[in-house]
Design a protein with these regions (language model features):
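Membrane-embedded alpha-helical segments that form the functional core of polytopic membrane enzymes
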Residues: 16-62, 97-101, 111-125, 168-194
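Membrane-interface helix termini and inter-helical loops of multi-pass transporters
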Residues: 29-34, 159-169, 241-244
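C-terminal ends of transmembrane helices
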Residues: 65, 122-135, 196, 264-273
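Structural signal for membrane-spanning alpha-helices in multi-pass inner-membrane proteins
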Residues: 19-27, 97-105, 124-128, 149-157, ...
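Extended hydrophobic alpha-helices typical of membrane-associated regions
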Residues: 236-304
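Multi-pass membrane catalytic core of lipid/isoprenoid biosynthesis enzymes
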Residues: 45-46, 64-117, 207-246
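Intramembrane alpha-helical segments
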Residues: 2-5, 74-164
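Small-residue-rich segments of transmembrane alpha-helices in multi-pass membrane proteins
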Residues: 16-21, 77, 140-157, 212-214, ...
Length: 304
């Protein structure tokens, strides 16, 4: 169980779920042309999980001192798992992930795509060792990588199968994935800032310069409120523009996504304690989960 917690298995489950839903809840129902066999798709999921798990491990290695302040009960490195073991696991998972990436890239006739796995692995290392100490940049990098976990499915499964004959449908489905990717990026970016609000004490002692440390909790909370409010308006606009005639999907978005985000907006305005921020971080995680779970519902939408 210690090793599962080290790689943050809940987050890995979420990544696997979203990739599976994109293929089997969106691509297959729309009968778009796809490139990967079921086996190779499973390898894509495994490669993504390996890179993500390695990123979680290296982040924990660099964050040991900070985590002893922010969440001492969850520290694993140096207590239940040695740093050497964690480093070996980090290297092994990266080798497996990148190796599978090379195989898949060549199997679809896009050998250059292998570089993506190397770049993602490098970004996760740089994030843990350096980028997370730069205001907002670390938050953006993590959020970008979350969004890319969705886009990777389209790059490897959808893009290579595009032809002149199927271009219109393939592009329409690709657009849906891009919308969800932007949703994941924006929501995760907000959540990363909320986590910075939650971890301000440990980050300050660890020398990490986050937005709450730079401008204070109150101002940061106001910025988060504005970002969340903009996201609410953006989702409502999307519903009006594209889902107006689809009542089931519109109601799902309204109650599962817009409603919780409005609750978040109300609570973040007056949030002051670590418990408040921890709760709000969980709210955003639930919203992201519910948002991703709406992917299969799009099979009932006529894409334009």
């Amino acid at each position: 169980m210690n090793y599962l917690n080290l790689v943050r298995y809940q987050n890995l489950f979420f990544i696997a779920l979203v990739q599976i839903l994109i293929r089997y809840g969106l691509f297959i129902p729309f009968e778009v042309d796809i490139t990967l066999s079921d086996f190779n798709f499973a390898l894509l999921v495994i490669a993504t999980l390996c890179i993500a798990a390695a990123g979680n491990i290296i982040n924990d290695i660099y964050d040991v001192e900070i985590d002893r302040i922010n969440k001492p009960q969850k520290v694993l490195i140096g207590k239940k798992i040695s740093e050497q073991t964690a480093n070996n696991l980090f290297i092994a998972l990266n080798v497996i992930g990148v190796g599978i990436g090379f195989y898949l890239s060549n199997s679809i006739g896009k050998p250059g795509f292998a570089a993506l796995f190397i770049v993602f692995s490098a970004l996760l290392y740089l994030y843990s060792s350096y980028l997370k100490g730069i205001i907002l940049l670390g938050n953006l990098v993590v959020s970008f990588l979350v969004a890319m976990s969705l886009i990777m499915v389209t790059l490897f499964d959808l893009l290579p199968a595009i032809t002149i004959e199927n271009k219109e449908l393939q592009s329409a489905v690709f657009k849906v994935v891009l919308y969800f990717s932007f949703f994941a990026l924006a929501l995760n970016f907000i959540r990363e800032i909320v986590k910075d609000l939650q971890d301000i004490n440990g980050d300050k002692k660890g020398g990490i310069n986050t937005l709450p440390i730079a401008i204070g909790r109150k101002r940061t909370s106001r910025i988060v409120f504005v970002l969340a409010a903009l996201m609410v308006f953006g989702i409502i606009y999307y519903m009006y523009e594209y889902l107006y005639n689809y009542q089931v999907l519109s109601l799902y978005f309204l109650f599962a996504i817009v409603g919780p985000l409005l609750f978040f907006c109300v609570k973040i305005w007056d949030a002051k304690t670590v418990k408040h921020y921890a709760l709000l971080s969980k709210v955003l995680k639930v919203v992201m989960f519910l948002g991703i779970c709406s992917i299969p519902l799009f099979q009932y939408v006529v894409l334009e």
